Swiss-Prot record:
InterPro entries reported in the protein's UniProt record: ARM-like (IPR011989), ARM-type_fold (IPR016024), NOP9 (IPR040000), Pumilio_RNA-bd_rpt (IPR001313)
Protein name: Nucleolar protein 9
Family indicated by similarity: Belongs to the NOP9 family.
Classification of source organism: Eukaryota, Fungi, Dikarya, Ascomycota, Pezizomycotina
Task of the protein: RNA-binding nucleolar protein required for pre-rRNA processing. Involved in production of 18S rRNA and assembly of small ribosomal subunit.
Keyword rRNA processing appears in the UniProt entry: yes
The encoding gene: nop9
GO cellular-component term (any): 90S preribosome
UniProt-listed GO biological process terms: endonucleolytic cleavage in 5'-ETS of tricistronic rRNA transcript (SSU-rRNA, 5.8S rRNA, LSU-rRNA); endonucleolytic cleavage in ITS1 to separate SSU-rRNA from 5.8S rRNA and LSU-rRNA from tricistronic rRNA transcript (SSU-rRNA, 5.8S rRNA, LSU-rRNA); endonucleolytic cleavage to generate mature 5'-end of SSU-rRNA from (SSU-rRNA, 5.8S rRNA, LSU-rRNA); ribosomal small subunit export from nucleus
Organism: Penicillium rubens (strain ATCC 28089 / DSM 1075 / NRRL 1951 / Wisconsin 54-1255)
Length: 722
């Protein structure tokens, strides 16, 4: 009897399993809702074991059990998300081509682009939901919303109404909802013009609802599902935006300090064109909202956490999806609604930390300690430290965190909480904090954890605290040799090839002329770039402090050779330090005179470098009171005019140094180089200096008026007759 022909391999096995499952699915009855099977005792034990394993990995995290959620919390979606259909091949190709045209932004003016957007809207009529849910075209919908006026926003908003519960949970459509909320917020106070219902060219009626009414419709649509959407991976981001819009708070997704910022989100930027104002400022500013928004916002915030007891509410603090929403709730509760809301026992902050004293061993102190070293929970603690009322923050700092600020600054996670604490400390507390942190400075410098010393320097400058002890701690953390100390500060290694390289000719060619290989230093990893960036920011902060702190940097700079200074000028991060050293108010004319002479003979290659060109620009202001040095530098640039004009960055240097004026009208350039024009422009409305003949005329007129005023009787008549 012949054997059954069988295919070997994992792919064939998976294919057969897939066919079997498909066959079983076709044989089963098509019930709309699947029955829920009661878990057995074995399954219950297995789930408990898995939960215990997770708790061992992260003791602060408590999973939210599905069975313990509030009834009606999970939306009734009948099993699956609704399917709005797919775009056909021609439609998809058209919208992708429209997306490319908007990215290229080759429109002559704003009116031409507006006409193009109108044509895309007319083509998208009736297909808005398909486009929003399309992986390839959802970005086009975001761009269209970003370029829309109030009328177009109302149209697209009306298309989404009734579908928001599903759209906010969709991977691609949720971003469209978020963009719609952000751009509709500034126009929410505009009143709808009272016009009779009319049909446009496509036969579509104008929506009757205003944008404010549409936002209220969104709230009504989502009101039964806030608790579920709180931890939904796609909806939570959109819910955060909605909460901030209802509160009238700015929503800036590009800011790192924003509650809606995300490293994974692809930022869609709309370039401006001629005749169009940049609209980015409106998103970063507060806006007025209707009176109906505030009670609706309070109800949303109450409903979100009403179905959770205090234990699970605290579990959200370490939940990667729920934590950002909890941050927004605390921010609105503590800053938007005032201090009175923080005293309410039912408020979110009081449920998280019921004991306002934060004494050691209390429930609140235990909760705070659990957040300090957690990568997710520490972000919530940052929000609490930043926005807590003054009395609560003082109790938290003095009873819980103040004595540990030195050890907390050593930790890479808790260090960010230390930054927020330093921002709120007064002068006396800041002195004590600096004394506690100073012993840890050498270890922080060694491990490249420089954010705490940098923030400490900045806050001492703001509060007027003497930074001499901190300067001594920093000096002890680096080498005693000034030349080596600067290399340690900036994480900079001196290369053997000291000749500066222009970036216009950064490729070298083989003898045969075929292969071109990049020359210069090897590529730097992201971690090394971050270390260099933080090191540069720390040194720049040190340069702003007069006294021993800035002298520590200046002595190191003056100990370097000209070749090393030129290499520093060509590094993107260290060049910022040179710019700061040349233009800072702490640099004396003696320091600038010694430092600027190091660049003579290297100005042209520096001017052809993208980083070095900024240093050359800084030399203009650095030599404001050293005219002979500035004139020599201008002569050096003049000798290489053609090289500078052939380079993009070189032309910028030529323009910033007013070299055309130097060649043609040397006297005018001299006046500008010495700052005479700036002094004249600074005194707006002041009269120009009088010439000597004008001064003589003024003296004669004044003497004549005095003589007229002194004459009396007959003498006055005689003077008048003259």
């Amino acid at each position: 009897m012949p054997r059954e022909q069988q295919k070997r391999g994992r792919r064939a096995e998976k294919k057969s399993q897939k066919e079997d499952s498909k066959r079983k699915f076709e044989e089963t009855s098509e019930d709309p809702v699947a029955k829920r099977i009661k878990p057995s005792a074995d399954d219950h034990e297995t789930n408990e074991a898995n939960d215990n394993i997770q708790l061992l990995e992260n003791e602060d995290y408590i999973p939210l059990e599905q069975g313990e959620q509030q009834e009606g919390e999970q939306p009734d979606l009948d099993g699956d998300m609704p399917f709005y259909g797919l775009l056909d091949e021609e439609e998809s190709e058209y919208f992708q081509r429209a997306n490319e045209m908007l990215e290229l932004n080759q429109f002559q003016d704003a009116e031409e682009r507006s006409l193009f957007v109108d044509s895309v809207y007319s083509e998208a009529n009736g297909k808005e939901l398909k486009i929003a849910c399309s992986q390839g075209c959802s970005r086009l919908m975001e761009k269209l919303i970003s370029m829309s006026d109030a009328r177009q926003l109302r149209r697209i908003f009306s298309k989404f109404i009734g579908h928001f519960l599903h759209l906010v949970q969709h991977r691609f459509a949720s971003h469209c909802c978020e963009t719609l909320f952000i751009h509709a917020a500034p126009a929410v106070m505009q009143k709808t013009k009272s016009q009779p219902k009319r049909s446009d060219e496509e036969g579509e009626e104008e929506p009757e609802l205003s944008l404010a009414d549409m936002f209220m419709a969104v709230i009504e649509e989502l009101k039964e599902n806030w608790g579920y959407l709180l931890t939904e991976r796609f909806a939570s981001h959109t819910i955060r935006v909605l909460l901030l819009v209802l509160a009238g708070e700015p929503v800036d997704v590009t800011s790192n300090e924003s509650f809606v910022a995300s490293r994974k989100k692809e930022r869609i930027e709309i370039p401006t064109i001629q005749g169009e104002e940049k609209a980015g400022k409106s998103k970063a500013e507060k806006h007025t909202v209707p009176e109906t928004f505030e009670p609706a916002l309070k109800k949303i915030m109450t409903d979100m956490v009403a179905g959770l007891d205090d234990v699970y509410l605290r579990a959200l603090a370490t939940h990667p999806v729920g934590n950002p929403v909890l941050q927004v709730l605390l921010f609105l509760e503590l800053s938007h609604f005032g201090k009175s809301s923080a005293k309410d026992p039912k408020s979110t902050i009081r449920r998280l930390v019921p004991d306002e004293s934060f004494e050691e061993g209390s429930e609140s102190a235990v909760f705070i300690s659990g957040l300090l070293y957690d990568a997710v929970g520490s972000r919530l603690l940052e929000t609490m430290v930043r926005y807590l009322p003054g009395k609560s923050f003082k109790n938290l700092y003095r009873n819980n965190l103040g004595d540990r600020i030195g050890s907390l600054s050593r930790n890479s996670t808790a260090g960010y909480v230390v930054l927020r604490m330093l921002e709120r400390l007064g002068k006396d507390d800041l002195k004590i904090a600096m004394a506690n942190i100073n012993p840890e400075v050498p270890g922080l410098i060694e491990r490249s954890r420089l954010i705490v010393p940098k923030m400490l320097i900045e806050r001492c400058m703001v509060r007027g605290v003497d930074t001499k002890p901190l300067a001594e701690a920093l000096e002890g953390a680096y080498s005693k040799d000034p030349a080596v100390r600067l290399q340690q500060m900036l994480k900079f290694n001196i290369s053997e090839n000291t000749a500066p390289q222009s970036e216009d000719h950064d490729m070298e060619e083989d003898n045969d002329g075929k292969d071109r290989k990049p020359r210069g230093p090897p590529p730097v990893s992201a971690a090394e770039k971050a270390e260099k960036l933080h090191a540069s920011l720390l040194v720049q902060a040190m340069l702003t402090v007069p006294g021993p702190m800035s002298q520590l940097v200046y002595t190191s700079l003056l100990a370097q050779s000209s070749e090393t200074i030129v290499q520093l000028a060509q590094e993107p991060t260290s060049s910022r330090v040179l710019q700061q050293a040349l233009t800072s108010t702490t640099s004396t004319p003696q320091i600038r005179r010694q430092l600027t002479t190091r660049f003579q003979g290297y100005l042209t290659p520096l001017a052809l470098s993208s980083s070095g060109s900024h240093v050359v620009d800084a030399l203009w202001s650095a030599t404001k009171d050293i005219f002979f040095v500035k004139e020599r530098m201008a002569q050096e640039l003049e000798q290489h005019e053609q090289e500078l004009r052939d380079s993009f960055v070189g032309r910028a240097v030529w323009r910033n140094w007013s070299m055309d004026l130097f060649k043609r009208r040397r006297r005018d350039w001299t006046h500008k180089a010495k700052g005479f024009e700036e002094r004249t422009e600074g005194n707006e409305g002041a009269e120009r200096p009088k010439s000597k003949i004008e001064q003589a005329r003024a003296r004669y007129a004044a003497a004549k008026e005095a003589a007229d005023a002194g004459a009396t009787g007959a003498n006055q008549t005689t003077v008048a007759s003259r």
